[in-house]
Amino acid sequence: MARQVICWCFTLNNPLSPLSLHDSMKYLVYQTEQGEAGNIHFQGYIEMKKRTSLAGMKKLIPGAHFEKRRGTQGEARAYSMKEDPRLEGPWEYEEFVPTIEDKLREVMNDMKITGKRPIEYIEECCNTYDKSASTLREFRGELKKKKAISSWELQRKPWMDEVDALLQERDGRRIIWVYGPQGGEGKTSYAKHLVKTRDAFYSTGGKTADIAFAWDHQELVLFDFPRSFEEYVNYGVIEQLKNGIIQSGKYQSVIKYSDYVEVIVFANFTPRSGMFSEDRIVYVYA
């Protein structure tokens, strides 16, 4: 048996008083049962807030027999709430929150269902994700990102409603070009708003290899070009992302695919003539 674990199943024979949720417990469920030999006992399942030893568990419920949970969360909970041979209960303390087992197959199955990106498992399934210093740096970056995003506020402008309406149409064949020549129209603030509310991919431009490597299949792609970038806009990478297929040659060659990508460009200038088909550009004047 593992020395310290989070999840424990237990049996307490001939209980004298009800159980209660200890401060160290995150979740508790149990019921009174009668065994085949007629013995009365509590059958239950506990999730601790942190890893706890067998000795520690026995201090919480003296006389109980504990075993490390072997099946899934749901199976352990169901076993502690089964109708036969229940006498009383079940009693449940705190909300039962299913989590993903930190195993590669479980994470892969969850990705199929939820569409989550790998980075979203970095905290909950850190062993499956990776055990390395680079993971810690990436996790720290995510914490910094979440803190920054939470502070972003938006002062709405009328042109933003037009973009919102366009996004409701879900047309991956076009490029929305938000043009504001003067500056100060709120283009960057609105781009930040889309990062915060729609998990958009944000870029100020660059080499195709760098952008393709950084893009993690987000459906909404934003290019927020500074005024000084007009002569260096990478029109090819915009087109590739709009098409939902792009080759990344950074570190290792890989082709990334997506069935739907919406691209928005924020700029103080309009695109160079002939770079895109005119019927693919939708202008919004900020």
Curated annotation (Swiss-Prot):
Its main location: host cell. Residues 2-96 form the CRESS-DNA virus Rep endonuclease domain. Divalent metal cations, possibly Mg(2+) or Mn(2+). GO terms for cellular component: host cell nucleus. ATP binds at G186, K187, T188. One of its GO terms (biological process) is DNA replication. A motif (RCR-2) lies at residues 41-43. Coiled coil: none annotated. GO terms for molecular function: ATP binding; ATP hydrolysis activity; DNA binding; endonuclease activity; metal ion binding; nucleotidyltransferase activity; RNA binding; RNA helicase activity. Homooligomer (Potential). Rep binds to repeated DNA motifs (iterons). Essential for the replication of all genomic viral ssDNA (trans-replication). The closed circular ssDNA genome is first converted to a superhelical dsDNA. Rep binds a specific hairpin at the genome origin of replication. Introduces an endonucleolytic nick within the conserved sequence 5'-A[GT]TATTAC-3' in the intergenic region of the genome, thereby initiating the rolling circle replication (RCR). Following cleavage, binds covalently to the 5'-phosphate of DNA as a tyrosyl ester. The cleavage gives rise to a free 3'-OH that serves as a primer for the cellular DNA polymerase. This is Master replication protein.
